[in-house]
Amino acid sequence: MNEKATVIETDVLVVGSGPAGAASTLLLATYGVKTLCVSKYATTSRTPRSHITNQRTMEVMRDLGLELECEAMASPAELMGENVYCTSLVGDELGRVLTWGTHPQRRADYELASPTHMCDLPQNLLEPIMINHAARRGADVRFHTEFVSLKQDETGVTATVRDHLLDRQYDIRAKYLIGADGANSQVVDQVGLPMEGKMGVSGSINVVFEADLTKYVGHRPSVLYWVIQPGSSVGGLGIGVIRMVRPWNKWLCIWGYDIAGGPPDLNEAHARQIVHSLLGDSTIPVKIESTSTWTVNDMYATRLFDNRVFCMGDAVHRHPPTNGLGSNTSIQDAFNLCWKLSHVLQGKAGPELLATYNEERAPVARQVVQRANKSLGDFPPILAALGLFDTKDPEQMQRNIARLKEQSPEAQEQRAALRAAIDGTQYVYNAHGVEMNQRYQSAAIVPDGTPDPGFRRDSELYHAHSGRPGAPVPHVWVTRHGRRVSTLDLCGKGRFSLLSGIAGSPWVEAAVHAAESLGIDLDVHIIGPGQELEDLYGDFARVREIEESGALLVRPDNFICWRAMRWQEGSGDELRAALKRVLSVH
């Protein structure tokens, strides 16, 4: 069958069902937007691929009511942190570093930053959670359906897709289209988004396998075991990796190849050889599940939209897996855009609001690509300290590594250099600020004219709360009827929120008038003694950066978009004016 079927109409067409596409479909369905998601594949991802799930992403899952379901499928933080460098899994250990906030000195930073926790949730487990709930909440999800082309006009987008089950093409008419179709995005290519950087910097091999490795890792639980041996510096990440998928019997190993020679022939014998080499024991029973190749990329889009087409995820930020930023950034792209789309489609905001997606997320795309690629540069000093760059002879490399055990002055210098190099990987594994410190500047943020004090500590390593417009609303624990409630739980869920102290009761009436006049949902929370919400720990007073009668206006994506230092005559009008500005209502 080749004839085109009747045109299908929807409000938003999402191309791709990976982390960005699945999150967009779920968020839009949750907000009541008519949404259709298409994927050329038969199902969600079959391979684990991305896995590190940071607190910002878990906050999105919490907002959607899915945090507990995600935690039930994930490996918790306590099984993630003993990051090991070794000559093979059964061989000599060269050093360890505590990662993902598990070091006692960093644990408090993570606990103070968010009500959620870091976890390891492989992509093949997270995607079905999001897609299943998207469908339950009303989204139309179609697999075996490949995006072919699109045309835009003043009122919408017409996309042609191919149904591979029926072998026919048909058109979908949408008011907006989201391109979340991965690093080889057809949507990005067709609308011609400008890209910077390069693809195919180096080549990598993934081998997913099953093996009971409890004996070797149960006492040093980690997500990543980095294997340094002759040949590990060729291609890939510059180092071999054994990655936990499910503790402690399912794994993914990464090995590089010379991209100039093209992808290798990955038969089962070759895959088994790679796995056993990294394990260091060819007698360990191994079941090869799948193999694949991929390339390290260093590319991002400088503009994320074209008229009614918005792109996100790997389509617009393409980078290596270092720092675990890929799926996290993709899901947060969706969290930024989807409330804006829902407000525009429901007549609560002007279409100009949608341009702020680009203003706010394009800098993030650039940041994560640059950080992930910069982190690759943190591994060569480890190899250099081991003397692996001093020779091309594999036997000499082994002797250089073995020198660590000697008691000579040269060996002492080598041990010090190795420890310093391993400690230098903090920006790879504990870059809490990269994950959490986004600050937005756009037409959907109303600055208050006060000078920005900047960050007190390293903004890549450490998270910092802020009450300034453009910052995420700070998480602290307040109480309702004696039970702890996060300030984040007072916000989000597709609605605007206003937070104030005990002297902020005038904001209640002002918010009602503003919300009614603009047709939006706006919740008001007064926090203080004798109120339904109390600040018994005093933390809200410490982080809000406003007076007791002031207010923080929080967008549906939990970012502060306006603040008033205090209530005064005319504050109600200022609130309404701020909302109109944020929503691009004229």
Swiss-Prot record:
The keyword Nucleus does not apply. One of its GO terms (molecular function) is FAD binding. Its EC number is 1.14.13.20. The keyword NADP applies. InterPro entries: FAD-bd (IPR002938), FAD/NAD-bd_sf (IPR036188), RIFMO-like (IPR050641). It comes from Delftia acidovorans. Transmembrane segments: none annotated. It holds the Pfam family Rng_hyd_C. Homotetramer. Transforms 2,4-dichlorophenol (2,4-DCP) into 3,5-dichlorocatechol. Belongs to the PheA/TfdB FAD monooxygenase family. It is an enzyme of class 1 (oxidoreductase). Its cofactor is FAD. Pathway: Xenobiotic degradation; (2,4-dichlorophenoxy)acetate degradation. GO terms for biological process: 2,4-dichlorophenoxyacetic acid catabolic process. It catalyses: 2,4-dichlorophenol + NADPH + O2 + H(+) = 3,5-dichlorocatechol + NADP(+) + H2O. Keywords: Aromatic hydrocarbons catabolism, FAD, Flavoprotein, Monooxygenase, NADP, Oxidoreductase. It comes from the Bacteria. Gene3D superfamilies: 3.40.30.120, D-Amino Acid Oxidase, subunit A, domain 2, FAD/NAD(P)-binding domain. FAD binds at residues 11-40, 304-314. This is 2,4-dichlorophenol 6-monooxygenase.
